Amino acid sequence: MSLNAETKAAIVAEYAQSEGDTGSPEVQVALLTASINHLQGHFANHKHDHHSRRGLLRMVSSRRKLLDYLKGKNLARYQDLIKRLGLRR
């Protein structure tokens, strides 16, 4: 199950660099993080759902690539995003 439109709109509004920004790495990483967190809750009840687990691993990999890109482009934005999302505990 994916995120609903209201949740996505709230995440986009919070992490967007400018009005109407949906493609910046910050927004993409925030949306992926929300989906990953949602799926982790799903796996608490459905341990043997291997098809969804593959999707989860794909999202984690995609998020890692976007974070690596952002880290190479602008370290300050990367560190701010990591802190805001609570990653790298």
UniProtKB/Swiss-Prot annotation:
Q: Does the keyword Heme apply?
A: no
Q: Which CDD domains match?
A: Ribosomal_S15p_S13e (cd00353)
Sorted UniProt keywords: Ribonucleoprotein, Ribosomal protein, RNA-binding, rRNA-binding
GO BP: any one term: translation
One molecular function GO term is: rRNA binding
Query: Would the keyword Translocase turn up in this protein's UniProt record?
Result: no
Instruction: Return the GO cellular component terms, semicolon-separated.
Output: cytosolic small ribosomal subunit
| Functional note | One of the primary rRNA binding proteins, it binds directly to 16S rRNA where it helps nucleate assembly of the platform of the 30S subunit by binding and bridging several RNA helices of the 16S rRNA.
The text of the family note is: Belongs to the universal ribosomal protein uS15 family.
The UniProt subunit note reads as follows: Part of the 30S ribosomal subunit. Forms a bridge to the 50S subunit in the 70S ribosome, contacting the 23S rRNA.
Name of the featured protein? Small ribosomal subunit protein uS15
The organism encoding this protein is Aliivibrio fischeri (strain ATCC 700601 / ES114)
Task: List the top taxonomic levels of the source.
Answer: Bacteria, Pseudomonadati, Pseudomonadota, Gammaproteobacteria, Vibrionales
